[in-house]
Amino acid sequence: LKLAYRDKYLRENPNDFLEKIESRDIHKEFLTQDELKTLASTPCDIPVLRNASLFSCLTGLRISDILNLKWENLCTAPDLGHCIRLRTQKTQTEALLPISYEAYALCGEPGTGKVFKELRRCMTGYPLKAWIKKAGIQKHITFHCFRHTYATLQIAAGTDIFTVSKMLTHKNVATTQIYAELVSEKKRETVDKISLK
């Protein structure tokens, strides 16, 4: 509509008659670095759920991308080390994302087909809640919260918002800005700064 108005197809800009929608405060739950370490050291009844969850915390990948992640998507780039090359399910964005050795190790022994073969979406419900509870974490954590964890811990560790935005494959840095607002202090730098040990 804005273009139609600008190109003189419309006499008036319809947007001038709309009321601005106020943005709501959206609370995004995430794990702190200590909670992440606690979760990583807590036994999980479903090993593939543990590995995929921690992988998401270390990479920021969505559950849809983890469920579809294949060994052929993992590669090594000369300047980046271990990487994931994929087209994201949600935004269809092509990306080459560096990952830490720790994240790569969670994938297990290289093979063919899907990386997390036994992972099912239903595991991200009750089994995930049971593992979180077993770890003593008193927050409402869903699988998507691991993506929030990645973003928040990266920003807290000092990674610039543009880099975090690219790692999350956000099309707009403003989307990533939400995480910056969750963080009150900056600490260190890039990929290896989020650790399970």
What positions do the PLM features span?
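DNA/chromatin major-groove-contacting recognition/catalytic segments
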Residues: 38, 95-98, 105, 109, ...
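C-terminal catalytic core of tyrosine-transesterase DNA break-rejoin enzymes
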Residues: 54, 58, 65, 147-171, ...
